[in-house]
A protein has these predicted regions:
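S-adenosyl-L-methionine
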Residues: 1-32, 43-46, 267-269
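Conserved SAM-binding motif I beta-strand of class I
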Residues: 55-60
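Conserved SAM-binding loop
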Residues: 69-70
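Conserved SAM-binding strand-loop segment of SAM-dependent methyltransferases
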Residues: 73-81
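A short acidic, Gly/Pro-enriched loop at the edge of an enzyme's catalytic core
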Residues: 85-93
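Flexible, glycine-/basic-rich loop-and-beta segments that form/coincide
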Residues: 165-249
C-alpha cells in the first residue's frame, strides 16, 4: 500500500452505486444480523442491507468514521477488528471490505485481506452469506480458505471508475454446513481469478443470481482492547504530564524595548568595521 493509503488506514469505501448492485442479489424474509468489520462511516453496509430488516453492527478503527457510523444508527465499536470478539456463527451476513495491504514485519507477511477473513469468517452461520469486496488478486490469496468454508461462490467485476482503479471485485459465498467444511473444492478456479479479470461478469441489476439470507438475532461485538482515545485524553490531563511539560517545554521569553542604536546606523557601523578590517 502507498503511504497515502496507510494514512487513511487502508480505507477504500465502496461506491454507493456498487452497494446497491450488491443489494439486488440479496434476499431476506425475516430480520437478521449483519456485521461489517471495517465499517467506515457505515454508508456501504446501510446501502447493501437497505429495507431488508437487518440488525447492523460494525467495527471501525478511525474515531471520526466510527462516530459517523454510530450516528446513523449502527451499533459500532471503535477499535481494531483483531481485538474484537464475536461468538461463532452469530451473523447471517458478513460484509467485508478489508484494508488492501500487507503486514509490516520482518518475514512471512500475510495480506490483510486474508488476515481479516481468517478472523471473521467464523462469525457467519451455516448458509449465511459472505460479501467480500477486494482487489482481484486477493481472491487467489484467500482461495483455499474461501473454498473450504463457503459454497455457491460467485465473483463479479465492479465497474465504477474508483472500483476499476483498484481492480475491485465482489465475491458472494454461502457458508457451508458444518459437515461439509474443510475441503477446498473449487480453490483452483478462484486462484485464476486475477488472470481473467476481464472475463468476469460485471455486477449489475440484471444479474440473476440470488442469495437468501437466513434469519438471526442481533449480534454482539465485544471489544477486548484498550480504549486508546480515552487513555490519550486522560494522559493530557494527568499531573505527571503537567509536571513533565514544565521541564520539557521551555516558555518563550518576550523581549521588549528600543534597540540600543537606530537600526540604519547599526548597519552603517558594521559596514565601516568590515572595510577597516579588509
Amino acid at each position: 500500500m502507498r503511504n497515502a493509503g496507510r494514512r487513511k488506514l487502508g480505507y477504500y469505501p465502496l461506491p454507493v452505486s456498487e452497494a446497491r448492485n450488491i443489494r439486488s442479489l440479496l434476499v431476506s424474509s425475516a430480520p437478521y444480523a449483519a456485521i461489517d468489520p471495517c465499517i467506515g462511516d457505515g454508508t456501504a453496509l446501510i446501502e447493501t442491507t437497505r429495507n431488508t430488516g437487518a440488525h447492523l453492527a460494525g467495527i471501525e478503527l478511525d474515531a471520526e468514521r466510527a462516530a459517523a457510523a454510530a450516528s446513523k444508527g449502527i451499533s459500532t465499536v471503535h477499535g481494531s477488528a483483531s481485538e474484537c470478539r464475536v461468538l461463532a456463527e452469530t451473523c447471517s451476513l458478513l460484509y467485508l471490505n478489508p484494508p488492501y495491504d500487507s503486514e509490516a514485519g520482518p518475514h512471512s507477511n500475510k495480506r490483510m485481506e486474508l488476515i481479516f477473513l481468517e478472523h471473521c469468517y467464523r462469525w457467519v452461520i451455516s448458509e449465511g452469506v459472505l460479501v467480500f469486496v477486494v482487489p482481484a488478486p486477493a481472491v487467489g490469496t484467500c482461495a483455499r480458505l474461501l473454498a473450504a468454508q463457503f459454497d455457491r461462490i460467485s465473483v463479479f467485476r465492479l465497474q465504477h471508475p474508483e472500483s476499476v482503479r483498484f481492480n475491485q471485485v465482489v465475491l458472494f459465498g454461502r457458508r457451508k454446513k458444518a459437515y461439509l467444511r474443510g475441503e477446498p473444492k473449487g480453490a483452483e478456479e478462484l486462484l485464476r481469478i486475477a488472470y481473467k479479470l476481464q472475463l468476469l461478469l460485471v455486477l449489475t441489476h440484471e444479474v440473476s443470481d440470488r442469495y437468501a439470507i437466513p434469519p438471526s438475532s442481533p449480534a454482539t461485538i465485544t471489544y477486548a482492547g484498550l480504549p486508546l482515545d480515552a487513555i490519550e485524553d486522560a494522559l493530557q490531563r494527568s499531573v505527571a504530564m503537567q509536571n513533565a511539560r514544565g521541564i520539557l517545554v521551555r516558555n518563550q521569553q518576550k523581549m521588549t524595548g528600543r534597540p540600543v542604536t537606530p537600526l540604519h546606523k547599526g548597519h552603517v557601523g558594521t559596514i565601516r568595521d568590515l572595510v577597516n578590517c579588509s
